[in-house]
Amino acid sequence: MVGTFYRSSSPTTAPFVDIGDQVAAGQTLCILEAMKLMNELGSDVDGVVRQVLAENGAAVEYGQPLFAIEQA
């Protein structure tokens, strides 16, 4: 396991992005917690979020797809 996937900054806040949202390159998509450190993961491209491929709170691995983004 590389880390834990979180869709929002806390349990009481809205997700950073939802399906159908427009995103810009560098925009925060989620947080990955690894070794008690919270790391924001940004989008590589401008586009539209088509799928969220990991469940909130799930353990994720290196190289595992987390989002499907249709590039603009």
Predicted regions: what they are:
Residues 1-72:
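Structured functional modules or segments
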